[in-house]
Amino acid sequence: MLTPTISKSISLVTILLVLQAFSNTTKAQNCGCSSELCCSQFGFCGNTSDYCGVGCQQGPCFAPPPANGVSVAEIVTQEFFNGIISQAASSCAGNRFYSRGAFLEALDSYSRFGRVGSTDDSRREIAAFFAHVTHETGHFCYIEEIDGASKDYCDENATQYPCNPNKGYYGRGPIQLSWNFNYGPAGTAIGFDGLNAPETVATDPVISFKTALWYWTNRVQPVISQGFGATIRAINGALECDGANTATVQARVRYYTDYCRQLGVDPGNNLTC
């Protein structure tokens, strides 16, 4: 028979072991996942790359591929940047807002942008990013979506990111960030109130570029190996892909192939969607 002292010691050890096991089990359950599933960047459970890849919060997350030694700043030269923005009219608000310096400052927070895979992969990713930015902003002319304030970009089903009825979640910035379910997590990741101050994306050029890079690294970069067409689908597939708007798709492709030419890299396959 155990003495009371020994019994209490064993009980304490048992409790500690149970608590430790419970803690390990619940690490992947903060968003309702079982321990063998990943909690995605959006708070959903699963075990594929959509859940365990980029942005995975908890669980058996996949290790990201190692970054290469490419210098994005050496590829995105002032000449390259000017070649885009110089095509915007002098009256464009974006001329006084967007700059290579703001892009590079924002880039400091996204160390994997343009640095995954081979040197050619990096150049293709950079070309793809600026192709979409060129299309979305009209060569850095527009900061905000034309007539965006008149449009409703509040998805009430995205209850995790409740809309402020006095705010609009229309397109802003280089990638034209839209919808409350993008402004909310982007603000959390970057450090601004995306739901209550979405206009920050149109007033702070560094934050503006950060939202574009946030969207890119979380929503677009995971599919970039599938070709430029996959990046179109990730950005605006519902409105453009599968024959919905072939003219717009071709416009994006033209920008992409032109930038690939400027950066000295083959554009690859699967250019359309």
From Swiss-Prot:
One of its GO terms (biological process) is cell wall macromolecule catabolic process. Residues 29-63 form the Chitin-binding type-1 domain. Pfam families: Chitin_bind_1, Glyco_hydro_19. It comes from the Eukaryota. The active site is at 136 (proton donor). Expressed in cells surrounding embryos, stems, seedlings, pollen, roots, shoots, inflorescence, flowers, siliques and leaves. Present in seedpods and seed embryos, but not in roots, inflorescence stems, leaves and flowers. Optimum pH is 4.8. Residues 70-273 are annotated as: Catalytic. Its EC number is 3.2.1.14. Belongs to the glycosyl hydrolase 19 family. Chitinase class I subfamily. Probably involved in hypersensitive reaction upon Xanthomonas campestris infection. This is Endochitinase EP3. It comes from Arabidopsis thaliana. The gene is EP3.
